[in-house]
Amino acid sequence: MAAVDHPASSLPHLQLLSDLTPPSLERTWLTAPHPRLPIVATCSSDKTVRVYSLTNFRLLSTISGGHKRSVRTAAWKPHVQGESVLATGSFDATAGIWRRWDSYGQTTGDEGWGLGQETTTNKSESQEEQAQETDILRQQQATHNENDGADDEDEEWRFAVLLDGHDSEVKSVSWSPSGMLLATCSRDKSIWIWEDLDDGDNNFETVAVMQEHEGDVKCVAWHPVEECLASASYDDTIRIWREDLDDWGQVACLRGHEGTVWFLSGPRIVSCSDDRTVRVWRRQPKEQAAAGGTGMPSILRPTGLDETWEEETVLPKVHDLAVYAVAWSKRTGLLASVGADGRIVIYEERLGVVRTEWVILAVLPGAHGIYEINHVAWANRADRDRDVSKEEEVLVTTADDGSVKVDETVGL
């Protein structure tokens, strides 16, 4: 019997839903999906954060005035009722806390948040410095008002707290699962943990400063459930941190990447690197670790280590240049990666009788034209008037040209 040719459209692929408009005219670093609303916050070199609707893909609000240089990172605080709380990190070496009441979010107009609506470049250190200098020159030019009538909304964002302590650019911010702790990391090689005292006066207290990394710390990420922190660095390592008797310390150091580790994500750990690889790491049960486990040679065991992590797999290699970001879907378990080659790659884990295998489901080359893609995130959205329970998951990517694109997965 002759083989049946399936039309290309029937194969698993990514399909562009929309660009978020209007975009920033400068480099966009990262997109942070809101934990419960169909909105995202994007971080730009023009010192602003833009908040967009994933229902109609339009700009809802522009947050500005808190940082003196590029906004590199942002994260929404979880488990907040009645308002949205956003943490930001900037090249000006500070982190900021922004607040906005959500009471108007139940409206049905396009302006509402309502649920039923609407790095580097082998970004090596020298290249990242050059990018930062370019950002500064751009910021000295005339600023662009892209708010499209959102000025009234902008006034409702309150710059509540400035967290000052790092000596250099803040590269990543991340809230703990409880929302009571905020981790920040910096080019100064340090990781800070701040506690939200939740006293009604916007007070934060520094509870730990960790300086074991030997290079720029690119990313921090919390375990989805436990108060366990992972960090990734220019020193090619991933480090795991826990609190013991009110003292935070390193409990594991993962080695295996042969270049800067840019990003971390997921319930296990998925990491990506300058070495063009994406790797998955798994924590061994304590009983197995105590018995000796498999003794992966890529794992160092610092003094007092109470956890053993092993490299579970290296995903199929697709990227030709540095991989800057990975995202693990909570809904489907799919992984997405992006990087300097402009590709979006989707991977799926397939459980076999003997071993687990990761396969490539889709590759979208040139997703942002000739530009490098700095970040990728999975986000939930629903069309206007659609039942929220039927919301879909989309992929949001940000790039050097300032564009933010929303893709849907077809046949995945």
Swiss-Prot record:
GO cellular component: cytosolic [4Fe-4S] assembly targeting complex
PROSITE patterns the record matches: WD_REPEATS_2, WD_REPEATS_REGION
Keywords of the record: Repeat, WD repeat
Residue intervals passing through the bilayer: none
Residue ranges, annotated region (Disordered): 108-154
Alphabetical GO biological process terms: iron-sulfur cluster assembly
Residue spans of the WD repeats: 20-62, 66-108, 165-204, 212-255, 257-291, 318-357, 367-407
Domain of life the protein comes from: Eukaryota
PANTHER family according to UniProt: CYTOSOLIC IRON-SULFUR PROTEIN ASSEMBLY PROTEIN CIAO1-RELATED, WD40 PROTEIN CIAO1
Family designation: Belongs to the WD repeat CIA1 family.
Biological role: Essential component of the cytosolic iron-sulfur (Fe/S) protein assembly machinery. Required for the maturation of extramitochondrial Fe/S proteins.
Protein name: Probable cytosolic iron-sulfur protein assembly protein 1
Species this chain originates from: Aspergillus niger (strain ATCC MYA-4892 / CBS 513.88 / FGSC A1513)
Gene: cia1
